[in-house]
Curated annotation (Swiss-Prot):
NCBIfam families: PRK00290.1, PRK05183.1, prok_dnaK. CDD domains: ASKHA_NBD_HSP70_DnaK-like (cd10234). This is Chaperone protein DnaK. The keyword ATP-binding applies.
Amino acid sequence: MGKIIGIDLGTTNSCVAIMEHGKPVVIQNSEGGRTTPSIVAYTNKGERLVGQVAKNQMVTNPENTIYSIKRFMGRRFEEVASEIKMVPYKVEKGQNGDARVNISNIKKQMSPPEISAATLTKMKETAEAYLGETVTEAVITVPAYFNDAQRQATKDAGKIAGLDVKRIVNEPTAAALAYGIEKKNEEIVAVYDLGGGTFDISILELGDGVFEVKSTNGDTHLGGDNFDDEIIKHLITEFKKDSAIDLSNDKMALQRLKEAAEKAKIELSSAQEASINLPFITADANGPKHLQYTLTRAKFEQMVDHLVQKTKEPCLNAIKDAGLKASDINEVILVGGSTRIPAIQKIVKEIFAQEPNKGVNPDEAVAIGAAIQGGILTGETKDMVLLDVTPLSLGIETLGGVMTKLIERNTTIPTKKSQVFSTAADNQTSVDIKVLQGEREMASQNRVLGNFILDGIPAAPRGVPQIEVSFDIDANGIVHVSAKDMGTGKEQKIRIESSSGLSEEEIERMVRDAEAHAEEDKKLKESIETKNIANSLIYQTEKSLKEYGDKITSEDKEAIENKIKELKDALEGSDVSSIKSKTEELQQASYKIAEMMYKDAQASSSNQDNAQNNAGSESKEADYEVVDEDKK
């Protein structure tokens, strides 16, 4: 088995790590960063940008720059109304009812897994550049509170990126692995994970290399983006008061506000106030307008207090579900960039009555944990066992629209549970099995993961047929369901895929598209490198002509100038092979100058040697004369 990389596919940033010599190593990307912005953009030429280069052009290309796509993963369109308001790009309803992004620069509707696959490809390439070998397998992390559809969407993204996803691991669990890899003592830890778009709290029991999740809770609509949004709304209100101009419909201004809000939030983690200066934010009949504002930490904390408080109830529920008291918890580990906010650290201290542990890097711990899990799967990391749980209850709809639970939340996975049901009407020959996930009593109030029909049931009075429904949750938290008629032995099975998710055909098409993009990216890189070499050669040759043009024949000089012109003409087009051949021709022609430069250098060296010899002779003669003078 080859190397299995660990990827933290984050809302704001992503990170990749690998096990080397028994230790996890975070891999730097091509720009030298240990984390990569989870941002994908398409330029007006249709070129795809990923990571920091995509982030750099966000302000000028807001509608074609996709960030926080994780908030839309595995979600139906009607579930993302609040998220749509937070982004400048266009989110539409897909054919399957899922949320999709319409990218005008390429005139294409793309699914969230397809967009996330671009970030995963960047992580894959980062690891390959470091290892010097092809990478095909990965462990990818997801928020603990992700439902089945969101987990499946993450696996789909991996597949589109050319990765065999060996395991989906919950982010808090991965962070606990990073924290506990060298711990030998038995202890109970809470992992408080507040990232860019999601919040998770998990309680784990650690001891003898066993990492057992006791409970998990969270909110997949809460993260650092929401804190940024509060600052943005405040700045829009204040600017409107001062200038009577509403910036809320100006997408370019909103993008600048987004950047400024994120920067101010980060500054306020270490300073008492942050200055926000955005010159030329807009203009009216009187000329350009500038935004200048000083945001204090006190004001910021007042604005986001409702968000901070929203993390409290999930924590209390997780403690309760684990059958513990806050005082039973030995350590509270902070994960995710948003845990640097002082108000967050303060509420964590209030909930758990202790100072949180800041010993793990909140930006890298999850990727490190994913790499450790990869090491466990390959056998490189020994004596470690991970026991995770399903975050939400699973069941089916039964008579009266009730949800009958087969697997309760916080059940250790993998797991399998079965229950026998019967028909609701006389002579019923088929049953529609509607698979649900959630905690509400009524089926309509929970999420429908999928449904299938078991038919061919012999006609009989209601209550007579015996139908066994089995739920099987694998180690990735992905659900498989089967229904079997005990009388006939007829069975129907499905692996639950979100009713709004991607079909196998769509995934295969997206894999082909991703491969085509990889080929396009390779060609683009080759084109850029070829043009760079050509331009560099033109510059050097023109410079040499100025210095040595008078030392070569007029025929040679004219030939070189013609080759420079031919290469410049080739650079006006996009034919890489033509640029290469014209570069080669100019290289050959310019050897005449190189010969003259070499001869000139030799002559200069010879003259210097002669001069030194002469200088040596003269100095001896002078010495003699001085001594002679002294004798007089």
